């Protein structure tokens, strides 16, 4: 297949003129490290006539550069882009979608003799019959036909795009927003609007509110502070559609948002928000629901969307937080078509106003997954809770529950605790765990037991880990005073010690090897990993003594058990999720209850 570059496309893209699928060659690509930890890639492109270095790869396309799919000399079709004018007048073409037609190793080199594009000094495409691009060899059995971009005229003005009521800038999709744009307007529906939150500290007082916006291309979170709260809070209505322009865009903090967008918006003094009456084609919501059964395999603290039937709802309770603030909470058991049940904790006004009668359908956008008591969910300040939503997933779930789901008890993923925090419905002896083949199913099982530490292996119990806050990857000593983390792709002058213990625990009937990670390992040893690392390096005898003192101590263990396969050999792996000292009063109460049950048989 012969490919010709789209001569004149560089000039048109620079001027913001619409170009339909131009064929370009990557002349150079350079990684730019961002101050917030997110790297960007700057690309120089050629159309055979001109080159331009002000192409930027959108962050979602970074893997193409990191995996060398997009590399120097490869030939690409630019499927979607946006040209932004920076404050200093420079133009940047942000690549939103691109496809590699010929990889770099399939190309002999640069096509033609392009020169850097300078506005106002363009040279016209050659009218000579000689081709301006070297013919590319057919691949994958193609018929040798020429690949050309769709019919286009690079000098024409772009087609008219929808404008805002003020006519200041065209409406763009949310998915195309990025910090390099200076003029843009989106038309989006408000799917969630928070209450006003206030704060007071040494730097003064303040307030904020946030909202989640959606259009047909994607979603984004917007936050307003202080003056913008006064200006916009009363105007914004959940469910309504608005034209929004001139917000500040920055990298999104994924710790507090589950929205599928690399950026988030901050309202500022120049922001304009205008109601939109023509809103029928703007979607109501974007959710990516995860089955309750699949929550077993998700990482702790993941923010996700879930939908289920309210199988049971506890009464609302009032609790005191660490900062002496009283809040409302309500625990709800959700079941879905997987037959699994999980506990959802709702907070604040959601907990107070929820009515669980009639087993309503609950859809939660942005719930946090926890491993407290097995697996459980909790709503956040930013979560959206929908009761009996008008969406296909809700109707399908209602039909299933009314027909057959109501008769299921369901297998709970959450350990249900009784009054006082000491009760637990999944107490097992170690012999029962083996006799009942816990962990042999498709999903892991959780159980609690009271057991005594018999032995802890101290060999290889400590490792040098990345010092970054959210990374625990093992580092490699570079032998030059620096330590390299492959995950973060950085070198550090220091590291942190992490624990991974292998211990043998026993009760009156059996014993079991278990694995303990950082927090539970520190509980068992009674020392933190940093101190243990110092002892290991400076005082081996004191280090050994810590392990000796840990033996024959008894704890309440909460464990995860799963049959895992290594090199075609299957074995049970038990991981300690939590370890606490025994509350002998609660333990005695439970033993008395069990004795009475046995006596009544």
Swiss-Prot record:
Zinc finger intervals, C4-type: 466-488
The UniProt record lists the keyword Zinc: yes
For this record, the Gene Ontology CC terms, alphabetical, are: DNA replication factor A complex; nucleus; PML body
Lineage: superkingdom: Eukaryota
Where found in the cell?
A: Nucleus; Nucleus, PML body
Gene Ontology MF term list: damaged DNA binding; single-stranded DNA binding; single-stranded telomeric DNA binding; zinc ion binding
Q: What is its main location?
A: nucleus
Among CDD domains, the record links this protein to:
RPA1_DBD_A, RPA1_DBD_B, RPA1_DBD_C, RPA1N
Biological process terms in GO annotation: DNA replication; double-strand break repair via homologous recombination; heart development; meiotic cell cycle; nucleotide-excision repair; protein localization to chromosome; telomere maintenance via telomerase
DNA binding happens at which residues? 184-268
Compositionally biased residues, Low complexity = 124-135
Question: Which Gene3D superfamilies does this entry report, sorted A to Z?
Answer: Nucleic acid-binding proteins
- Entries under InterPro entries matching the protein: Euk_RPA1_DBD_C, NA-bd_OB-fold, NA-bd_OB_tRNA, Rep_factor-A_C, Rep_factor-A_N, REPA_OB_2, Rfa1
What's in the keyword line of the UniProt record?
A: DNA replication, DNA-binding, Metal-binding, Nucleus, Phosphoprotein, Zinc, Zinc-finger
Q: Which family does it belong to?
A: Belongs to the replication factor A protein 1 family.
Question: Assembly state and interactors?
Answer: Component of the heterotrimeric canonical replication protein A complex (RPA).
State the name under which the record lists this protein.
Replication protein A 70 kDa DNA-binding subunit
- Naturally occurring in which organism (per UniProt): Danio rerio (Zebrafish)
